[in-house]
């Protein structure tokens, strides 16, 4: 019995430590590592619960899914409205080459591909579930930026730039409290883009 309890305690501590100081943090928001099965970190049960919570807001405000881009009267949705999929546009963020490579063009074009992240890390390194509720008519999109590798004239998804880490404000959901938040989530970590 003691061995069984010890095993459960070790498993619990391992899970907590992995989530608290996660060594498997994605390089960028939309790049989900598979080592810990992160692609399925948000279960179907959780997705359904989030869908229901978002639907409750739209029902309360009497807003159809089609008109949900105005985000109703909920403060988290109003504040984080910039990244709603129907209204988001590719931004003018650029990544610049390191000094002293002046002979290369200084800017990389913004990639036109977007993704719909299901989880991310806040600027405090805390794991968050990012709200995606397609059935209720609410989806959040983040554009993938290309960065320049050190000393290279090629724009790609790897390498480094001189700018600070880019962050976006997205609607997140606290499962325990059933509350929506608008929080700063890291977009590019290993390949920072200008925010």
Swiss-Prot record:
At the highest ranks, the source species' classification is: Eukaryota, Metazoa, Ecdysozoa, Arthropoda, Chelicerata
Task: Identify the keywords attached in UniProt to this record, alphabetized.
Answer: Disulfide bond, Hemolymph clotting, Secreted, Signal
Range of residues in the leader sequence: 1-20
Source species of the chain: Limulus polyphemus
Q: Where in the cell is it found?
A: Secreted
Summarizing the function annotation, the protein's role is:
Coagulogen is a gel-forming protein of hemolymph; it hinders the spread of invaders by immobilizing them.
- Write out the GO cellular component annotations: extracellular region
Q: What InterPro entries does its record include?
A: Coagulin (IPR000275), Cystine-knot_cytokine (IPR029034)
Full protein name: Coagulogen
Oligomeric state and partners?
Coagulogen is cleaved after Arg-38 and Arg-66 by a clotting enzyme contained in the hemocyte and activated by a bacterial endotoxin (lipopolysaccharide). This cleavage releases the peptide C and leaves 2 chains of coagulin, A and B, linked by two disulfide bonds. Coagulin molecules interlink to form a gel.
Q: What is its main location?
A: secreted
Gene Ontology BP terms = hemolymph coagulation
Q: Which residues form a coiled coil?
A: none
Instruction: Report, as the record phrases it, the tissue specificity of this protein.
Output: Hemolymph.
Bridged cysteine pairs (disulfide):
28-188, 30-115, 80-182, 85-141, 95-189, 108-161, 147-191, 155-193
Q: Which family does it belong to?
A: Belongs to the coagulin family.
């Amino acid at each position: 019995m003691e061995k069984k309890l010890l095993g459960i305690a070790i498993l619990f501590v391992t899970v907590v430590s992995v989530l608290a100081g996660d060594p498997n943090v994605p390089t960028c928001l939309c790049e989900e590592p598979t080592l810990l099965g992160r692609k399925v970190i948000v279960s179907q049960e959780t997705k359904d619960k989030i869908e229901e919570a978002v639907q409750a807001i739209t029902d309360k405000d009497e807003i159809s899914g089609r008109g949900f881009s105005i985000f109703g009267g909920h403060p988290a949705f109003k504040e984080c409205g910039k990244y709603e999929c129907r209204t988001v546009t590719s931004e003018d963020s650029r990544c610049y080459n390191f000094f002293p490579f002046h002979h290369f063009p200084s800017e990389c074009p913004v990639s036109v591909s977007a993704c719909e992240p299901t989880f991310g890390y806040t600027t405090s390194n805390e794991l968050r579930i990012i709200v995606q509720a397609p059935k209720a008519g609410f989806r959040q999109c983040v554009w993938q930026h290309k960065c320049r590798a050190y000393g290279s004239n090629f724009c790609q998804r790897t390498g480094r730039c001189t700018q600070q880490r880019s962050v976006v404000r997205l609607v997140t959901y606290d499962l325990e409290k059933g509350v929506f938040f608008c929080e700063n989530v890291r977009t590019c970590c290993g390949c920072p883009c200008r925010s």
